[in-house]
Every structure is written in C-alpha cells, then in structure tokens.
Amino acid sequence: MKVGAVNWRRARAQHRLFRRALRAAGAHLLELPFVHGAYDCVFAKDNAVLLEKRGQRRALLASPVFRQRQQEQQARARVLDRLGFDIFSPPPVAFEGGDLAILPGGRGALLGYGQRSSQRAAVMLEIFLDAPVTPLELKDPHLYHLDTALHVLSDGTALVCPDAFTPAALRTLERTEGIRQVLSVPREEAIGFGLNLVEVGSTVFVGARTAWVQALLRAQGRCPVELPLDQFHLAGGSAACLVSQLHPAGPAASDARPLPSSRMRPEPSPDSGQGPSGYLQ
C-alpha cells in the first residue's frame, strides 16, 4: 500500500460524495466528530463494534495496536455514549474493528488475527456478540486487516484474497457455517482496496478500479458503484474503513450486561468539526 501526503480538499470532497452516495442507496448515517490530532480517526470502523438488540445500542470498544489510534478511543466513547450506546470496555488484548466480519443474520463472525488483532480477542467478542467467532490467520503484512482481504456479502458469499491467509485459515473459512461459497480475488486487486467494500441492499460501493471484483459482484446480482477514494488509500484505507455498521443482534443474542461505563468515560471535553460517517441499516 502506498502511504503519502493527502490533499485534504480532495479528501473532503471524496468524503462528501461518499456520504451522499450512501444516503442515496438507503443508508442512514450518523456523523462522528473529528478527533483533533488523531488523523486516522476518519477510519471509523476500527474504533468499535456496534450492535443493536431490541432497540438497545451497544458498543464494544477496540484495543488498537498503535498509539496514534489509541488516543481516539476516549473521545469515541464519549460520542457513542451521547448517541445512546451502552459502552463495553475493550478486550485486554489487541483488537481493531477492521478485523471483524459479521456473518449474515448475526449468527457468527470472522476474526482476522496475526497483524493488528490477537486471536485471543475472539473470547470477548463471542461474549459481546453471543455468537461464535471464527479466527482466521492473516499472513500478508500488506493486507493487515480482515476487511482488506475478505468481504462477506449478505447472502453468505465470501470474496477472498487467498494470498492473505494461511492454508489452515482458508480451510477453516470454507467450513464455516454461514459461508455459502468462497470466490477468489487476485492479490493485486486486494492490495488496491478492491475488497474494502460497503454493501447497502443490492448496491456495493467500491473505492477503487477493480475489474475482477466488480465482475464477481455483478455475477452475484449486485450493482457495484465505483467511487473515488484514492486520497484515503494514501492513508491506508477505503470505503469499508470509513464506516462502522450498526449490526443487528443474532437470534441467540442474550441480554449481556455492559461493563461499568465509568471505566471508559473520562471528564467530558468538547469535540468539534465533521468527520467520518457511520451507517445504520
């Protein structure tokens, strides 16, 4: 992945276009404020896993590896609290939201580990989701989050870059309940953020020119919409990184108690400015 200086005017224009496209496709958006000094906070997916059960919103905060992302978490906890989320303290091991893929119907999830998240995070994720979590080992340092190496469509079709996973992880994926079929995507398209997708109904937003991925999507009855997000590629993310979906709880989800909110609620401080979008479906 190429990392370089971002043209902030172009980035803001691309972000506004992305927000408009999501709304036009039927997504409901919540705006999260920019965290001053934490420039990667635009990648809202990494901060927390969001879940809704019987009208109650819950947020499991992430445990980012790098200090640059760690400094976002208290500000994000305050905002999510104001939005009505019960705040769950983060796992005691490394975990970032970009390494979790919720399976259709909320019946389980996939956890990418080995780069930014720990396999041991699966234990707390299973408690939070009240659903099985299947760990998959990532081996390519250039595909460091699960959402750069894999996307699971709403029908259970998994678009996968095989080069990103260990052989054992690929075998596990193919046997995972909820995965209907596995379709391979070449590494060059995954490296270009071709699997960092956002699905809203039959529309799938793609932040890069990826002929292979878009052909697969059309073959599955989806309508790929390509949007310019190259300025975010320079910072290491694309469409899926920019949003955090509020997932419906699976049929087995129970009424778990949130950890004491005071553990993650420091003294309030003002947040200002407009930043990334989260979307609810």
Enumerate the predicted regions with their spans.
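The feature marks the mature, well-folded catalytic cores of soluble enzymes
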Residues: 1-265, 278-281
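Cationic, low-complexity basic patches in intrinsically disordered or flexible, solvent-exposed regions
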Residues: 268
